[in-house]
From Swiss-Prot:
Entry protein name: Translation machinery-associated protein 22
Gene Ontology MF terms in the entry: mRNA binding; translation initiation factor activity
Family matches, as NCBIfam families: DRP1 (TIGR01159)
Annotated GO biological process: formation of translation preinitiation complex; translation reinitiation
Domain remark text: The SUI1 domain may be involved in RNA binding.
Disulfide bonds: none
Subunit structure, as described in the record: Interacts with the 40S ribosomal subunit.
One Pfam family linked to the record: DENR_N
Family that this chain belongs to: Belongs to the DENR family.
InterPro entries associated with the record: DENR/SUI1_TIF, DENR_C, DENR_eukaryotes, DENR_N, SUI1, SUI1_dom_sf
Keywords: Cytoplasm, Ribonucleoprotein, Ribosomal protein
Species of provenance: Meyerozyma guilliermondii (strain ATCC 6260 / CBS 566 / DSM 6381 / JCM 1539 / NBRC 10279 / NRRL Y-324)
Length: 201
């Protein structure tokens, strides 16, 4: 029996649709730019002057102009929406907080990812697998999702998140690493108090 090789399907790095369907999404302009950079051959096949001429050859001039105008209006509206969302994303930041649980044991809390359309549960599973540790999604004090990862892997997590954002064209987003000093001092104070109580006995 002849083995049938699975067909390789390219998905857009911006909207995640196959490139043939990008025009129906809200980020068509960015999708076209992504395709031109990543698959020049398919870009020419879909968007060269010949391809566009063939696609509209059966339409009347009036109908063609009407469709073009409606599509342009829709795309302008969607692009304005995308522009607002992009500005919001670029103004946001991701925080990786390193928290000391007890001596030599740490966890990191990653927050601020919810505005970037990133699947938090999927990312926590990726971290658990990649760093061979525990990871879960919880709600922080602001009632927003954050990823808690066991172990001091803040540098590795930062590198991975920066790469993830870069793939989405969000290179300018700041990924900030901080130490939770309050928790650390509180833990030290608790240990000191426990030691003092023990000495009195």
């Amino acid at each position: 029996m002849t083995e049938v090789e699975p067909k390789s399907v390219l998905y857009c790095g911006v909207c995640s649709f196959p490139p043939e369907f990008c025009e129906f999404g809200g980020s068509f302009k960015r999708c076209k730019e992504w395709l031109e950079q990543n698959d020049k051959e398919l870009y020419e096949k879909l968007y060269s002057e010949d391809a566009l001429a063939n696609a509209t050859s059966t339409l009347s001039i009036d109908k063609e102009q009407k469709i073009a105008k409606e599509l342009e209006k829709k795309q302008a509206k969607e692009e304005a929406k995308q522009e607002r969302e992009l500005k919001k994303q670029l103004a946001s930041k991701v925080t990786i907080k390193r928290i000391e649980r007890n001596k030599r044991k740490h966890v990191i809390a990653i927050s601020g990812l919810e505005v970037f359309d990133i699947d938090m549960k999927k990312l926590s599973k990726t971290f658990a697998s990649k760093f061979a540790t525990g990871a879960s999604v919880t709600k922080n004090a602001e009632k927003k999702d954050e990823i808690i990862v066991q172990g001091d892997v803040s540098d590795e997590a930062r590198a991975y998140i920066e790469k993830l954002l870069e793939e989405k064209g969000l290179n300018e987003v700041k990924v900030e690493q901080i130490d939770d000093k309050k928790k650390k001092k509180a833990a030290e104070a608790a240990e000191a108090a426990a030691a003092a109580t023990g000495n009195k006995k």
